[in-house]
Structure formats: C-alpha cells, structure tokens
UniProtKB/Swiss-Prot annotation:
Homodimer. Pathway: Metabolic intermediate biosynthesis; chorismate biosynthesis; chorismate from D-erythrose 4-phosphate and phosphoenolpyruvate: step 3/7. It holds the Pfam family DHquinase_I. It comes from Clostridium botulinum (strain Eklund 17B / Type B). Belongs to the type-I 3-dehydroquinase family. One of its GO terms (molecular function) is 3-dehydroquinate dehydratase activity. NCBIfam families: aroD. This is 3-dehydroquinate dehydratase.
Amino acid sequence: MKRIVQVKNVKIGEGIPKICVPIVGATSKEILDEAEKLKELTLDIVEWRVDFYEEVFDIEKVKDTLSKLTTTLNEVPLIFTFRNKIEGGEREIPIEYYLKLNLEVAKTKLVDLIDVELFIGDDLVKEIVEVAHDNDVKVIISNHDFFKTPCKEEIISRLIKMIQLNGDLPKIAVMPQCEIDVLTLLYATNEVKHKYPNNSIITMSMSGRGIISRIAGEIFGSCLTFGAAKKASAPGQIGVEELNSVLKVLHENI
C-alpha cells in the first residue's frame, strides 16, 4: 500500500500531485506580505525558504517570524527549508548552525515538514529526522544538483538512501544538459515508483528543458511539484495557476 504523507488536511502521495509555492522574502514584512498574497492562489503547501531571510542567523527572530507566518497561513501546511548555496540556496551557513536551526525549529512544532539535505552526512540527517519525528514533524530528505544530471543508477541510489535514512519524502532535483537527461530523471523516478511502491517521492528536472517533469509527476511517480507565485526559487518553475490547470487536465485524462 502506497505511503501517504498527511500534513494537516493535505495527503501527499494520493491522487493529483500537490503544489508547493515558496516564500523567498528577505524581511519579516516581505515574508508575511507574500503569505497574505498566497491566500489568493490555488495551492496545497507553502515552503519558507529561510535561506533568503536576512535575520536567519538569529534563531529567536526566525521563531518569531515563523510564528507569525503560521498564523497567517492558518491551515496551509508549511515546509521549513534552509537551502545551502552549494545546492542552489541563497547563502551558506556553518553545519553546526544548520543543525541547531533545524532542531530548534522542529521543537517549536510550528512547521509541518522540514527539508534536510542528504549530503550533510548520515549522522546529522538521522539526528534531525529523529527530533523532527519526536515532535510530529515530517521530513523531506533532499538533494539538488544545479550543474548536471547524474546517471539513472546514481539518482535511484540517492533516493533509496533517503528512504533508508527514514525520510518521509525523498526529494531530488537535477539540472539537464540535454533532453536525454530529462528522460534519465523520469526513468529513475518511474523505477523507484515500481520498486518501492510504499514510498512517495519528489523528483524534478530543472530549467525550461525539464519542465515536463514538473507536470507529469502523476504519470512517472513524483507526488509534489513546485510552482512560482512571484519570484521562482529554482529554474523552470511554472506559475501556480498555469500549473494547476495542466495538472488537472492530465489527472482527468490518465
């Protein structure tokens, strides 16, 4: 039986792929203003990309903004993400602070999911996963390659590793250098879908070349896609209303 990851009233892994929209404001005001505007859109989940937040090194300010953000979003599930620069993020932070930030946020129980980067190391990933689960927070274990698309076997290997580390939602995003790279990502996604049917996964091929991967998740096996409300947080993101329309057409004709 396929594993459904439920956050609030949203069931990730069931039916049509869910749409997540990132918030990338630099100040608390910008973040909360973005959240207000998102209420007008048809979306399922919001991701706070805290690496864009100028006060990210002040945990108390992070918690304060987080509290206000969850109040504004109300019943919309929230992903908390600090994306390191090497994986396409806005800035880099020391690994010790990355760990502390994620653990402290998990303990607030104000977020529904935390995104943890696979390559921070197994022990740190396990520690964050354990604390998050103890506080009823789900975990996305992720990997982003903004330079290339690894071979099919490597993509599959990374997704399996995320499953073995007890991630609720393994996620991989890769950069295609040609059309075949996009097919490689889709092939790997489909293979994991069939070999590990009990696990929901998130995959995407970035840039305009990889756009098919953002809309065809229901066919190949990716349960969540990212759309842009304003500023895209990754290359190739589609406007959320357009994304909704395309996903609906595909869903109704599969």
